[in-house]
Structures are given as structure tokens and as C-alpha cells.
Amino acid sequence: MKLNLFILGLLTLAAHAYALVARDKLLLPHEDPFFQPPDGWQDKEVGTILRSRKVTIKTLVKDNLKEAWQLLYRTTYTSDDEPTTTVTTVMVPHNAQNDSLVLFADFEDSSADRCAPSYSWRAGSLDDPSASTRVAIAMLYLQEGYIVTMPDKEGNRGAFGSGHVEGRQSLDGIRATLAFDKLGLSKDTRVAGHGYSGGGIQIGWAASLKKTYAPELNVVGWSAGGVPSNLTALIEKINGSPFAGFVVAGLTGVSSTYPEVKEYMEKVFTKQGLEDMEFPKKFCSTGIVLRFLFKDFFAKDFSKVGDRYLYEPVVRNILEKLTMGTNPDYTPDAPMLLMQAKNDEVAPYEAVKKTYDSWCQEGAQVHLVTLNNPLSSHASTTVTSSLPGFLWVRDRLQGKLAESGCHENKNFDVGINTNALGEDFKGILGILQGFLGDKIGPNDEYLIDWFKKHK
């Protein structure tokens, strides 16, 4: 079964149409009483469940689910003395296994709470052209029988790109899910995680922080693709490009997390620049990309100091802390799969290779797959990496040991075999392959054309 882009478009339009109705019925997280913690929550241990509720998921996964839950839990921001709370959405398939748990890192790529999975997956309001792809990847794990937990990893500040926040809140989301008595999980449950692009930030930092922040978790492997492992390198690469909107999205998320960065940016950004920084707090990734197509965020209409704000010590030091592989203490202690297109025009390949080299020097167990096909791009690799990522996670959860040490190999695929997992998975893999169709090419020409038409 191969769905073409026309069918994918219908699925996306259907999601939009449904969202117009659903949004009227659902409260946004900042309006929803469920998200307000009870008295005394600050004194609880991280990962403690403060409240739970059963919910309905309105994306395409709904037919694969026995039930879904949301858990409000205690967590932190960048340090232990910054207590906060957030929510994870737990999806339970009909054939659920209680010896395995998958952390699915959805890529929000925005600071707006309407884009958090706790809201968008309930409202059916995933708003970008890859929405069906993201849902289909989650469906792979549900179809296999894995319980999937999907944290709102940005917290109340909308900390997009702030890896220490995303990592801590993801690990605490795992703790909360394992402790939830309706699932039959335990501290011995095997845990693995998968994420792509913005979800790769979440997975990369959960993997990095696990050894020091949550050493008790039985994590057996992590899978990540299209990883923005170095935000400075990403900003330098995409500024002025069709994907320039992710520059302001990242700056907004980091400044919301680190007060010293926010204070500095308020001094050096223009009035227009500060107005631009408000946009990612209200809109999701597609709206952000459309608003800032080809925008130069080093220009004088945005910054009084040109590109120098990126290299000012107060900003540079934080961005260095948010670069994977710079601190030996934050080296993954569970096997990790990295998948990156050599021609990735959003998340620079060279930065991921440097992270890989740094982790390996510290004794990590990492497999780097380089997608070398000239047609491989950031968007196409979402699909190309989905099947090998799933197979790798499944092997780890089934107790198969990953190859020791570090190793690399090249992959020239630019699609997936929809028959690879048998009849039960054929429709899901068809949705994924359908996103590629026959129009994906170098530098994500299909997506760029889509964004231009919808500007």
C-alpha cells in the first residue's frame, strides 16, 4: 500500500478541519485546571504523579489504542532548585506489553502550548505537512504492542531547544509512566526512546543526562535522527533559508529558559526583533516557518549588533552548554543509534559527527548511520530513518545486545520497504512512504514549495 502525496494532503486537510471543531472543545494547557498542580507539589520527588486522567486521542493512532492517559508530574527545569510540573500523554495499545516502554519524542519546534502533544494529539491539530508521518512513526511502536509515553518536554516556559530542560522532563516522564498503577509497568521495565529533528534534541539530551539524573532507569537504547546537536551551527546554517523560522523559535525557547540570555537579547534586539520573538509563543512550527521564510536574523531590522549576539559570552556560553558532547559527564550510558543525512540542510551533519566522535572518546556505545544519497534531506530522512530506528529499538527491547563500542556505516536508501514488517504494518509504512511520493528531492524541494504556496 503506497499513499501518494494527494492522499497525504487529504489526511492533513482532514486533520485541519477536525481541529477547527476540536479546538473549541479543548482548553489550552495554560487554561486547563488539570495542569495546575495541587498544594505541596514542590515537596514531592521528581517523577511523582500529581494527577491523572483518561483522554481521547484524535490523530490517526486512535484505532490502535485501547486507552490513553495523561499524567501531571513533578519535574525540574535546568537544575534541581527549579521545580516545575508538566504532563506526559501515555498511549496504550490493545496488545500492550508490560515489560517494555517507548519514549516517543514528538517534535514541537515551538514555544506555544497549543503545539504540545498533550493538546495537539487530543485536538487533532498537528499542523505541519509531515503530521501524518509523525503519527505513523508512533503507530509503528503501538502496533508492536509497546506502551508509548510522550512528554510535554518544554514545561510551562516553552523551552524549545533547551536540552537540559527537555532531557530532565523526559526522564521524569518515564519515571511517572513506570509508576502509574494502571499500566502494570515496573522499575525493571525495559525503556527505549526514539525521536527525530526537534525530537532528536529531546532524545539526545535524555540520553546525555540519564547517567547523572536518572541512573535507576532501565534504559536499553536510544534512537535519534536529524539531530540538531549544536544550536549555534544550526542557526548559522539555516539563517536566511526557507527554514529560518527555526532560528527565532530556538532563540525564543532558550531565552525563555535562561533569564540572563533574555535580558541580553532585550537590550540588543530591535523592537521588530522582540516582536518576532513573541511569534513562536503563539504559533506552531508550520506557522513559524511560513512567517519567516528566508528571514535574515542577523540583519539590522532584527538585531542592533548584527550576528554578534550569537557570539556574546552570555549567549555563547549557554549555547555551548546546549551542545551535545561538550561535557564528558553527559555521555550516554545506553546504546545509541544516530541517523543523519550528509546533506541535511537544517541540522548540520558535521555537528552530529563531532558529537559522535566526542561521545565515542568517552566510551559511549554509538552507531552512526550516514545517509549518503544525494536526494537525502532533513524531511526525507524522517521517513528513511523511521524503519531502521524502529527495528533497532525493537531489538533492544527484545533483549538483543547492540554492537559494542562505536561504529559507522553509510546508507543510500531514500525510502522504505513497505513489506518489511509484514501485512500488519504495511498500511503504516505506506503512510510513511507516501510522504516521500516521487517529489522529495535535494534540499527538501517539496516542503519548500509547500511553504511558499501557503505563505
Curated annotation (Swiss-Prot):
Residues 1-19 form the signal peptide. Its EC number is 3.1.1.-, 3.1.1.3. It holds the Pfam family LIP. The keyword Secreted applies. The active site is at residues 197, 344, 378. Keywords: Cell wall, Disulfide bond, Glycoprotein, Hydrolase, Lipid degradation, Lipid metabolism, Secreted, Signal, Virulence. The keyword Phosphoprotein does not apply. It is found in: Secreted; Secreted, Cell wall. Disulfide bonds join 115-284, 360-406. One of its GO terms (cellular component) is extracellular region. Secreted lipase involved in Dandruff and seborrheic dermatitis (D/SD) probably via lipase-mediated breakdown of sebaceous lipids and release of irritating free fatty acids. Has triacylglycerol lipase activity and is able to hydrolyze triolein. Mostly converts monoolein to di- and triolein, while free fatty acids are only produced in low amounts. It catalyses: a triacylglycerol + H2O = a diacylglycerol + a fatty acid + H(+); a monoacylglycerol + H2O = glycerol + a fatty acid + H(+); a diacylglycerol + H2O = a monoacylglycerol + a fatty acid + H(+). Glycans are attached at residues 98, 230. This is Secreted triacylglycerol lipase LIP4. GO terms for molecular function: triacylglycerol lipase activity. It is an enzyme of class 3 (hydrolase). Belongs to the AB hydrolase superfamily. Lipase family. Class Lip subfamily. One of its GO terms (biological process) is lipid catabolic process. It comes from the Eukaryota. The lineage of its organism: Eukaryota, Fungi, Dikarya, Basidiomycota, Ustilaginomycotina.
